[in-house]
Amino acid sequence: METFKVVETFVSINGEGKKAGRLAMFIRLKGCNLNCSYCDTTWANKRDARCELLTAPQIVERIKEAGVELVTLTGGEPLLDENVSELIGSILMMPKVEIEIETNGSVPIRYYKERDNRLTMTMDYKLPSSNMEENMCLENMEYLKPWDVVKFVIGSREDLNRAKEIIERFRLCEKAIVYFSPVFYQIQD
């Protein structure tokens, strides 16, 4: 049975996005393929970061014990794990549970194009201040659903202008929910 490198699990009130205010279990998987300038979880992406090796049934058991109906798979980048679809499938076997996948936008989501609204993608689009924009998987824009979220982390006026370009180019407001999130102490007048 496959195992997943889990650096932490915790229950908290979701603080951002479409599901803000809801109680959620966060499952943070180890590893990321990007190195964003403003990353707030670099510790979870280091090679020597401590983690538990958990199977999908063990993770499902933790979700059941927590008694929540919203699970947020985050990282790092949770879609890097080649077996994450097994974990997603196991979690969705729980009838009332919804999953929100926080993805950095660099990994293809086409494998999840056939899904209902119990599986939501919250996808970052990395802007110039992240130093990672060249890694964005633009084909992901084709696979967004109306219940998905595209999040732009804004660290400069250049970022704001670029976000506007991307929103217009891909007609994102017609495809998904769009959010801006500021990088604190970055934008100057």
Where are these regions (language model features)?
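Cys/His-enriched microdomains
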Residues: 30-34
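Conserved AdoMet/S-adenosylmethionine-binding subsite of the radical SAM
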Residues: 79-189
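Conserved Radical SAM active-site core
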Residues: 4, 11, 23-24, 35-118
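A short beta-strand-turn-helix
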Residues: 12-17
